[in-house]
Amino acid sequence: MTKQAEVDYPHAVGDIGREWLRTKPFRHDPRETARLLIDFGYVLQLLDLHAGTKLCELGCGPGWMTRLAARQGVDAMGFDISPEMIEIARDQARREGIEVRYEVADMENVDLGRRFDACLLYDALHHSRSPELVLRSAFWSLRPGGRLLLAEPNWKQRFEGREASQQFGTTELGYPPRRLKRALREAGFVDIERFHNNRKRLFSNRPVDVLAHVAEPLAYRILGAFWTQIWLRATAR
């Protein structure tokens, strides 16, 4: 798997795939739309994004997270290795009348000068074979005291991403929380916290649903090392 596959991804997915990239997070499957919008709510909360916050997103893809953040008054900027992906992001920002800057950059090697208040890595790190390099880039994007938030599918992505890897040639790896925490410390981050995202789903008053809701924290404790989504927040020294 090469970086060129990441560069070519928007072309490789065809017309239907590009339409999804343009309309993300909204699609025909309401459950997927709900999942993505709930995740965005967690990003707002965990990074304390508000008007005037300077945010960069590494591996921004079509830029939907940064566009939604900009609607909150956030001063947002997105970076992605694919020029075509950046063009999609810029075009959507123009269509929506939103001011967001997008630039082509490799998240493993980008120097942003320690000027941002917050940095986001959402569903991006598993496309890199060198997460340590990406986290160093994230560290050097942040002012001292700035916060990084990363969301990753966990180690299971090595199995769930096989189809995409075989079809498009993209890198689809999964990293366990322990490795990511170690890499964060080595990059210079402190106050590393993990959060479990249950998306606060509604549940009925049927006994089986109530029992499942009560048992959920234990399940996250057991499965968190390799299966459930990873959310890590850290502070740059």
In which residue ranges do the predicted regions lie?
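Conserved class I S-adenosyl-L-methionine
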Residues: M1-D48, L149-T171
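Class I SAM-dependent methyltransferase "Motif I" SAM/SAH-binding loop
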Residues: G59-G61
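Class I SAM-dependent methyltransferase SAM/SAH-binding core
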Residues: W64-E108
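A C-terminal cap/extension of S-adenosyl-L-methionine-dependent methyltransferases
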Residues: E96, Y102, L112, L149, ...
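A short acidic, Gly/Pro-enriched loop at the edge of an enzyme's catalytic core
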Residues: E108-A118
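A short glycine-rich, Lys/Arg-flanked "PGG" loop and its adjoining helix->strand segment in the class I
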Residues: E132-P144
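Short alpha-helix
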Residues: L173-G188
